[in-house]
Amino acid sequence: LIELAMKGKRVLRLKGGDPFIFGRGGEEIEGLMKKNITFQVVPGISAANGVSSYSGIPLTHRDHAQSCLFLTGHFKEGIISFDWPKLIAEKQTVVIYMGLLSLQEMKKNLIKYGMSKNMPVAVVQSGTTQSQKVVIGQLRNISSKVNKARLKSPALIIIGTVVELRKDLNWFG
């Protein structure tokens, strides 16, 4: 972005989803601002919002979840460093972006820190597209179900009792 803009080019950075939710939008803008390069941000629909809607899984629901956490399962150093006890709150949905490769480790830690092994989980591959695949399970068995279904990235993980609503709210197929 900076290199081309400094050459006088008009540059468009097209990002699927919302550039400010695990999209490096903030980091890129910091660089542009340091060089006094003008820019504009057009926010998109975050993957969590789009994928959950196309999967028939509301992220919040008065009977199930009054809060929702967005987390990344992809780390600079490759080390998962969540504050695990904070992820275990009742009536909360946890959404994990880019977490397919670390699903087994995250599952073990969630159970270790007190989340029920029967907590509903959805893993959605290629959400909002005609290739969308949704695998539903519980913490205790989601890894084996995902492996059996041969899910690949991009995938979003949704954890919480809201996942149970999919059986009645699924409209996309």
Predicted regions and their residues:
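A contiguous loop/helix-start segment that scaffolds small-molecule binding in enzyme catalytic cores
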Residues: M6-L12, R24, E30, S67, ...
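Short glycine-cluster motifs
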Residues: E3-H74
